[in-house]
Amino acid sequence: MKAELIAVGTEILTGQIINTNAQFLSEKCAELGIDVYFHTAVGDNEGRLLSTLEVASKRSNMVVLCGGLGPTEDDLTKQTLATFLGRNLVFDELAMAKLDRFFASRPGRVRTPNNERQAQIVEGSQALQNPAGLAVGGMIEQDGVTYIVLPGPPSELKAMFSESLLPLLSQSQQQLYSRVLRFFGIGESQLVTVLADVIDKQTDPTLAPYAKVGEVTLRLSTKATSQEEANLRLNQLEEDILQHDKLADYFYAYGEDNSLVKTVATRLAEKRQTIAIVEQGTGGLLQAELSLALADQPYFSGGKVVGQLGIESGWLSEEADCIRQELQADLGLAVSVLIKPESTEDNVLAKVYLTLATPSGISQKEIDLGGYSWQYLRQLACLQAWDFVRNTL
């Protein structure tokens, strides 16, 4: 199904408010398997809204109008849609009863005739009740196009969508199921190049790459009527992806909200191992990230932060083992970021030294990083450290 979102309101065109409804509705439509092809904004003008509806009705199967349902003269959405469809406006009994209760409980407020407009719907519509306000919405199908009318205030729109509209859309629509693969150690452009043949021929399922700080994610999506049906398609696509040019070597986890440090935290908890950390050049960022990822789990024994001149690469093995024994941890991680003298403010060059001490021995790794700001380079150094620990666990 092809959908179009029409935001009605001059305040959107003049930049007085941001159209956050479009982002919310697009995301929810995607979850339902509804393809949103167009976002449109139009002012509070009947003629221009009629022209917009004329265009939308010819290129979309679903037209969602947001805003313009209030009691004032410039709230024209329902009236204009009724004119476009050649129908009348009628009162919805439930919405009118809610309006009655609202004013009955507020005797000091004057009920003017224009308030009644909020309880009107296009004749033949299925009313969409408003849990967070007074203006009723509606849904109607005519000539193969479904028209949906929603309020403009985001709190009302979200409540109406979730409680009134979503159950109706879910009855007949396939849903969009997604799976996120996370990769570290490969850039977005390289990943896209490796997967060019898969990307070029994609239909359903689809895949979309997203560059994050120091890593790349791939979102695999398919439309299906059940999770089981979706898994069959997503499993096949994932297998195809990971067989390309050793991409499995860069893949480390699933999930939109996952991360390298969360992966390390999970493995520490699974193995019931503790870790102590000494870091130089990262400002305590490693310890802060791990503490947050572990929450109240007792697998971070503690650590220390050493100043820029505190650790040189040759001392790391001793530092890692000392911190491990001092804090009685299973693992001791020592990280040192040494800035090279030729660095500039916007082009920091550094050597990152990583050492992990365990009861069975020492593992070490050196990485050259450069071409970034100092803040970004610190984040990358931490990612390298977590990937190093992950591969060692």
Curated annotation (Swiss-Prot):
Taxonomy, superkingdom: Bacteria
Extract the InterPro entries matched here: CinA, CinA-like_C, CinA_C, CinA_KH, Competence-induced_CinA, MoaB/Mog-like_dom_sf, MoaB/Mog_dom
Pfam families, alphabetized = CinA, CinA_KH, MoCF_biosynth
What the entry lists under CDD domains is as follows:
cinA (cd00885)
Which family is annotated? Belongs to the CinA family.
Q: PANTHER family per the record?
A: NICOTINAMIDE-NUCLEOTIDE AMIDOHYDROLASE PNCC, NMN AMIDOHYDROLASE-LIKE PROTEIN YFAY
Protein name stated in the entry: Putative competence-damage inducible protein
This protein's species is Streptococcus suis (strain 98HAH33)
The organism that produces this protein has a lineage beginning with: Bacteria, Bacillati, Bacillota, Bacilli, Lactobacillales
Gene from which the chain derives:
cinA
